[in-house]
From Swiss-Prot:
Pfam families, alphabetized: YchJ_M-like
NCBIfam families per the UniProt record, alphabetical: PRK01842.1
Name listed for the protein in its UniProt record: UPF0225 protein RSc0270
HAMAP family the record matches: UPF0225
Family as reported in the entry's similarity comment: Belongs to the UPF0225 family.
């Protein structure tokens, strides 16, 4: 499954809550732009979860930690209703490493849940080497 839901209209609110979809996460999902910061990448990945865009999630996941069964995990996604995102902190340790702490609220089967995570990101060039000119990728995260 690449995308189970259609992309929002460009003027519609972005699922990440940071603006209009066409000026926020939409260009990243379409491949027209790349996130300049780890926070932008994290927000675009949250929106991709909302839209069930597994192709984008895979494209922005570090190859050493990306699950091989990502699509299978998305089979339960329609039962998940994402409610909102709150970015608590974005810290850039150096030009190629950053963390983003966030809380994502969602419902499954009518029950409310919170996902509180500190995610780790690395910036890699096309050859897979760490580079300040590379693109940000999600590595992993610690749940709180």
């Amino acid at each position: 499954m690449t995308r189970a839901l259609p992309a929002p209209a460009p003027t519609a609110a972005c699922p990440c809550g940071a603006g209009a979809y066409g000026r926020c996460c939409g260009p990243f999902h379409a491949g027209d732009a790349v996130p300049a910061t780890a926070e932008q990448l994290m927000r675009s990945r949250y929106s991709a979860y909302v839209l069930h865009d597994t192709a984008y999630l895979r494209r922005t996941w570090h190859p050493s930690t990306c699950p091989t069964d990502l699509e299978r995990g998305e089979a339960d996604a329609p039962a998940t209703r994402w409610l909102g995102l709150d970015v608590k902190r974005h810290t850039q340790q150096d030009p190629t490493h950053a963390t983003v702490e966030f809380v994502a609220r969602y419902k499954v089967g009518g029950r409310a849940h919170r996902l509180h995570e500190t995610s780790r990101f690395v910036r890699l060039d096309a050859g897979g080497a760490e580079s300040p000119q590379g693109r940000w990728l999600y590595v992993d995260g610690d749940l709180t």
